[in-house]
Amino acid sequence: MKIADIVAQKKHFPFFDCAYQGFASGDLENDAWAVRYFAEAGFEMCVAQSYAKNLGLYGQRAGCFHFVTHTEETKTRILSQLEILQRSEISNPPAYGARVASTVLNDEALFREWEDNLRTMSGRIIEMRGRLYNKLVELGTPGGWGHITKQIGMFSL
């Protein structure tokens, strides 16, 4: 993968923000492909996952932070720093959202239902992109609008 090669060549540190996992393709596994690729390629990296959007837990601060490393020493140092940051930033995070996320992630039937809901939402996003594109073309709106249907996810540039 070209991006991974450049990141390695320039000695950059990858940080993935997975705030909308499942919305791009409708599949959690597919949307996490790049993260798995970098991990399998041996990169140390950070991954932030939020359940605010894809589980509808807005304002609940439900999510995960992962630091992928290869040494026990680095793991110990990172854990120490994360504990300090967590204490100063959110010493008492809301528990409700974390409980909901944990319940969904650990119950096979609820997890499958969540995956089905993500597929539905992703399909709706694709449908809305198509409708927006068609309306812009129908109205003769100046500009090229092909990017709206070529891109994926909730946002369009």
Language-model regions: role of each:
Residues 1-13, 18-57, 64:
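Active-site pre-lysine segment of PLP-dependent enzymes
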Residues 31, 94-97, 125:
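Hydrophobic alpha-helical segments and helix-packing faces
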